[in-house]
Amino acid sequence: MLNIENLDLHYGAAQALRSVSVSAEIGKVTCVIGRNGVGKTSLCRAITGQQKGSRGSITLDGKDIGALSPSDRARAGIGFVPQGREIFPLLTVEENLKTGFAPLKVGDRYIPDEIFDLFPVLNSMLGRRGGDLSGGQQQQLAIGRALVMRPRLLILDEPTEGIQPSIIKDIGRAIRHLASLGTMAIVLVEQYFDFARELADQFILMERGEVVMAGDHARMGEDDVRQRLAL
């Protein structure tokens, strides 16, 4: 379980996050929604250790990870699918997947068959360069790479951005399946409410670096959420 309490984050003098508190439970999808520039990606960077918070705490399965490096947080069980995918265009699909081996013990360094069950296209393109894949296929590759690490916490930052509708549905099915396994907590960062609504067990709505609404489907008024996202 991920637990964040009263997290502040600064880029120099600019404050990106203000007293953010978020929790994400194993077997559930926690969706962080909001318009561009409200701090969603900064929250991801704080969780993964790419940017250190200036106040507050971050714990994973009860252990404080605030002082850990990004690589140590990966070893602790955090898998991250960044906005823009960031696959290696000159490496093959198989080589890209194997970059997920880095935090694993030697005996665990193999690609689980489940990844190819979720995204069969990857199995048929193992020898192709990542840069030759479509945007949607690259997104599936980026998710697969994170899953190679067997994460306890999977963070997906804007996974539908620039993706064709058919693959968005595939990604949605994959997220739903992963949550149903009950082995990881999933944080889905998204600005499109319709996609988030289909998957989320709970919502976190952000504005100007702050959490302004939080709750499950019953507590989050759809009209109010849509109005805030449209502002």
Feature map (PLM): residue ranges:
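Catalytic Walker B motif of ABC-type/P-loop ATPase nucleotide-binding domains
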Residues: 154-158
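Conserved ABC transporter NBD signature motif
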Residues: 56-63, 76, 108-111, 215
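Conserved ABC ATPase signature
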Residues: 129-133
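Helix-to-loop junction immediately C-terminal to a conserved catalytic motif
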Residues: 48
